[in-house]
């Protein structure tokens, strides 16, 4: 059984805080099963973006853990490219979360 997305995001934010990183929920999606995108701003006009891994890439030995994959082949990407990608994803899936 997979954790509800809202609980997973809350735990992820707490983990970031414990590690000394600043993290916020930029967009709140579906409480139960929304996809999660993690954006890491490098504060220099570039960002890394990670999204849900395709089902074919999931490791069944890890159970129901969430898996992520880089959204751009060349990381970091420009902030404009990351924003454009997120806008396209939001049009496709209105239930997604952005952290």
Predicted regions and their residues:
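Long, hydrophobic N-terminal alpha-helical segment
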Residues: 1-35
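Short, intrinsically disordered, mixed-charge
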Residues: 11-18, 43, 52-55, 88-91
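Short, well-structured hydrophobic secondary-structure segments
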Residues: 22-55
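Helix-rich interaction surfaces within compact, conserved domain-sized segments
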Residues: 53, 60-99
């Amino acid at each position: 059984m997979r954790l509800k997305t809202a609980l997973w995001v809350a735990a992820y934010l707490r983990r970031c805080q414990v590690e000394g990183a600043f993290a916020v929920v930029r967009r709140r999606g579906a409480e139960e099963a929304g996809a999660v995108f993690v954006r890491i701003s490098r504060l220099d006009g570039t960002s890394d973006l990670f999204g849900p891994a395709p089902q074919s890439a999931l490791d069944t030995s890890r159970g129901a853990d969430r898996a992520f994959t880089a959204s751009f082949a060349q990381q970091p990407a420009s902030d404009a490219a990351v924003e454009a990608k997120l806008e396209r994803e939001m049009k496709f899936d209105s239930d997604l979360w952005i952290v």
